[in-house]
Swiss-Prot record:
Statement: the UniProt record of this protein carries the keyword Amino-acid biosynthesis: yes
Protein name per the record: Serine hydroxymethyltransferase
Database matches in InterPro entries: PyrdxlP-dep_Trfase, PyrdxlP-dep_Trfase_major, PyrdxlP-dep_Trfase_small, Ser_HO-MeTrfase, Ser_HO-MeTrfase-like, Ser_HO-MeTrfase_PLP_BS, SHMT-like_dom
Annotated site, Plays an important role in substrate specificity, chain positions: H228
Major localisation: cytoplasm
Gene designation: glyA
Entry keywords, A to Z: Amino-acid biosynthesis, Cytoplasm, One-carbon metabolism, Pyridoxal phosphate, Transferase
Quaternary structure (record): Homodimer.
Free-text function comment from the UniProt entry: Catalyzes the reversible interconversion of serine and glycine with tetrahydrofolate (THF) serving as the one-carbon carrier. This reaction serves as the major source of one-carbon groups required for the biosynthesis of purines, thymidylate, methionine, and other important biomolecules. Also exhibits THF-independent aldolase activity toward beta-hydroxyamino acids, producing glycine and aldehydes, via a retro-aldol mechanism.
Binding, (6S)-5,6,7,8-tetrahydrofolate: L121, G125, H126, L127, S355, S356, F357
GO biological process: glycine biosynthetic process from serine; tetrahydrofolate interconversion
EC number in record: 2.1.2.1
A single Gene Ontology CC term: cytosol
Organism: Baumannia cicadellinicola subsp. Homalodisca coagulata
Membership in a protein family: Belongs to the SHMT family.
Length: 417
């Protein structure tokens, strides 16, 4: 028999020390990785609940195990909230990750060897949109579109490639693109060749939920997302669709279970349900608007200090700094900023002369700093500190002074007070 007062700290000191150190790091570092965020204590409570004990293969009302009456209620809540939030009539909340959600979409709608048209990873796409090292690049014939010289998606190129190669599926979505995607144009191109339009909105789901970024659901045949990132929930995935056939929805469900997964993670699905409810609150809309305001504020600082921002700006939560003209690699910038307790990620830029391990750019995102209370004034200060570091990456005086400023602002904006 277990007692609720047993804990990790008194049993596994090595593990608890690592957890405590990570908690300290999160409080004392400024998080600018665009795909990271801070989830709420309610979500963590759900994920740490007794729901982790229950196996529930199948779907609500159609389980392969008994004793699922209450976990059925949990999953139904998550499904209903996802449908309401994203204005769709189909939602699968079981994918363990965004990549697994994408895998399910591919296997439901495509056959191995089919042609897909996705955004080039080097131009802002994602591994699962056809990168050669990923399953999507190994299982399918991949054609890639990219951005033009101004850093915007080249829709003319996309249309030409679609007309030439007749892909079975066109993929929209990104991991490092800072502008609004024209879903309508993508729909028109897909219709012209009778292709599926699949949108991966993992990075922008929170913005979409708040009405800050155009919703791809009315345009796409199917949409996937992660539930962390801008949505600020637990790590996991969703599959969404509107106006599709029962046959397609059945294929999507079957592709998740039993096609790619076994038992769903009911404690994580509960976390998704809480996060989706939180995303319906007025405060969430205010938060998402602030995410974009902070990103735009930071971009303006970099431009004013003669840094090159890919596409010249941002319409969402992220942007890329092109450091070629500064003679700094992304790897060097990442390391220097890390020393000052500012966390970014090195990132390839369009036509990058460096390898993907070194890179010539860094990606910066504002969801996490906004979640802990940063406003435009804070974002303005932070961007200037980053400029100071990047202009003085070997100057310990500047680096140490910046680290002190970072610790002070983190103390005044705690993540979990």
């Amino acid at each position: 028999m277990f007692k609720y007062d047993i804990n990790i700290a008194n049993y596994d000191t090595a593990l608890w020390k690592a957890i405590e150190l990570e908690a300290k790091r999160q409080e004392e570092h400024i998080e600018l990785i665009a795909s990271e965020n801070y989830t709420s204590p309610r979500v963590m409570q759900a994920q740490g609940s007794i729901l982790t004990n229950k196996y529930a293969e199948g779907y609500s009302g159609k389980r392969y195990y008994g004793g699922c009456v209450y976990v059925d209620q949990v999953e139904t809540l998550a499904i209903d909230r996802a449908k309401a939030l994203f204005e769709c009539d189909y939602a699968n909340v079981q994918p363990h990750s965004g990549s697994q959600a994408n895998f399910a979409v591919y296997t439901a709608l495509l056959k191995p060897g089919d042609t897909i048209l996705g955004m080039n990873l080097a131009h802002g796409g994602h591994l699962t949109h056809g990168a050669s090292v990923n399953f999507s690049g190994k299982m399918y014939n991949v054609i890639s579109y990219g951005v033009n010289k101004n850093g915007y998606i080249d829709y003319e190129q996309l249309n030409k490639l679609a007309t030439m190669h007749k892909p079975k599926m066109i993929i929209g979505g990104f991991s490092a693109y800072s502008r609004v995607v024209d879903w309508d144009i993508m729909r028109q191109v897909a219709d012209s060749i009778k292709a599926f339009l699949f949108v991966d909105m993992a990075h922008i789901a929170g913005l979409v939920a708040a009405g800050v970024y155009p919703n791809p659901v009315p345009y796409a045949d199917v949409v996937t997302t992660t539930t962390h990132k801008t949505l600020a929930g637990p790590r996991g995935g969703l599959i969404l669709a509107q106006g599709g056939s029962k046959e397609m929805y059945k294929k999507l469900d079957s592709a998740v279970f039993p096609g790619a997964q076994g038992g769903p993670l009911m404690h994580v699905i509960a976390g998704k349900a809480i996060a989706l409810k939180e995303a319906m609150e007025p405060e969430f809309k205010i938060y998402q608007h602030q995410v974009v305001k902070n990103a735009k504020t930071m971009v303006n600082v970099f431009l004013n200090r003669n840094f090159n921002v890919v596409s010249g700006g941002t319409d969402n939560h992220l942007f890329l700094l092109d450091l070629v003209d500064k003679n700094i690699t992304g790897q060097e910038a990442d390391a220097a900023l890390s020393y000052t307790n500012i966390t970014v990620n090195k990132n390839i830029i369009p036509n990058d002369p460096q390898s993907s391990f070194v890179t010539s750019g860094i990606r910066i995102g504002t969801p996490a700093i906004t979640r802990r209370g940063f406003n435009e004034t804070d974002a303005y200060q932070l961007a200037n500190w980053i400029c100071d570091v990047l202009e003085n990456i070997n100057n310990e005086v500047v680096l140490n002074a910046t680290k002190k400023k970072v610790l002070n602002i983190c103390a005044s904006h705690p993540v979990y007070s």
